[in-house]
Amino acid sequence: MEHVAEWNVHIYLFEHDADTTLARAVMETPATKLTAEGTARRNPADRPVAEIGDELAVGRALVALGEQLLNAAAGDIAALR
């Protein structure tokens, strides 16, 4: 039997202040809900380009989410032994 599933990740962006962007990645599956956050801070010497802060914050949130998924899988594998 073929296993087919769809997991969605929702990304929420927040401008904390003029130089700080926060991102939250939320993934819900039938079995669990994982949430991870990422932050980007603009160097005052750099030009303000919102898209760059968004990309950095989201990328960091997704990396953290990936780490949580890998840890969850490792725990599930250990529980099978």
Question: Where are the language model's segments positioned?
Answer:
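C-terminal structural segments of small proteins and small subunits
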Residues: 61-81
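Short, well-ordered alpha-helical segments
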Residues: 48-67
